[in-house]
Amino acid sequence: MNARPLSVAVIGAGPAGIYASDILSKSGLDVSIDLFERLPAPYGLVRYGVAPDHPRIKQIIVALYKILQRGDIRLIGNVEVGRDVSVAELREHYDALVFSTGADTDAPLDIPGVDAPECYGGADFVSWYDGHPDHPRTWDLSAKEVAVIGVGNVGLDIARILAKHAEDLMVTEVPANVAEILRTNQATDVHVFGRRGPAQVKFTPLELRELGKQPDVNVLVDEEDFEYDEGSQAALAASNQQRQVVKALEGYAMAEPEDLTASHRIHIHLFSAPHEVLTDEDGHVRALRTERTRLTGDGTVTGTGVYRDWPVQAVYRAVGYASTPVKGLPFDSENHVLPNAGGRVLGEDGEPITGVYATGWVRRGPVGLIGSTKSDAQETITNLVADAQAGLLHADTDDASQVGHDAVTVLLTRRGVPFTTWQGWELLDAYERQLGQDYGEVVVTSGQSKGRERVKVVSREAMTELPRSEERRVGKECR
């Protein structure tokens, strides 16, 4: 083993990267850990992928905060690997690299017309309303009737945000630009489409039940969409969660007409496969054409040749997330992951690249929640520790002074990269919370007055400059 601590860079400061760093720090190795993040703020999809009206899920940040607050894991934010520093350079400065860059782009949907201007990626919309600094500040919400393709929780999030009254989102952490545009939202009817049946939808029961609790929003499901074959029955028998989902869907389907008086509606359509986005003579969305499907016996479906056109003026794709390639590493473009075995990244020859690892969605694809992320990180770090104990991990340099945090931050400073730190994030976090307090009370649809926990800062420049300015101010006061 080296006389100096093992130096490890973890790339990606979402849950996967933070949990991997935490597990490594407690592994018993003498280790120095730097956690890189391409955005100025940590937490990944918990900050930029969870709907703003889901503070319960955002409580995960409390656990992640406690890990980073300890100080034994150093955050280096606003640094993009492949742009500000290369993989090859990181391998010179660290004994091992762990990639946890996640999956934050939309999986493709290959149907005619999907490139129309009012066809949007669900991940892009989520990034917009969550204040991602690399996404546009504006969004067209003029459509009164909207289609959402995909029956997972992201599809429900999109439908709920579009159907919800703007004032009920003003109490969340949405940025100022998002709040302003949400007030112009014209959507009254949001149609959610899934190609299979109730036994196959990917909603979780809690998310689905929550959909029906939105003020002045009705959820409608067609009674004809409840069909089950042998495969469906087996799926329901094996999963209590799926039985709860079906029960919730049946509850919506059995609602009495006199109770469906809300001004906004979410329609869930099953056995409806997207076939084509129809446009008018100017190329703008006018309808979504779907094909009715039927079960084949094993839970899969086939088309029936029966089509229906749904008048909509916008279409959102929510058919899954995909990882993006890491410049300088092999990439499995079919599965959208870094090729790996047990978290060890594989080269073009199929052999492990010594000292390079992957964890989280970039390792296994966009499936699983926090529990899966933790077990995934555990396996990857276990293999990293084994490789370290076998003496396999060494930085690509013989100069010990070029290994680790100080050498990398000198390199970034020399290049003019305005990287952020954990201390800087705490200053920005406090600033956002103060913006929430300063906003005051908001009257929501129910008539209640509520305060705001925070208001997100969106601009990358502001996110990097605000904490630096505050650090300079505090420094002057301490002189």
Language model features: what each stretch is:
Residues 3-14, 143-149:
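Beta1/beta-strand and adjacent pyrophosphate-binding region of the FAD-binding site
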Residues 29-42, 169, 177-178, 195:
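Glycine-rich FAD pyrophosphate-binding loop
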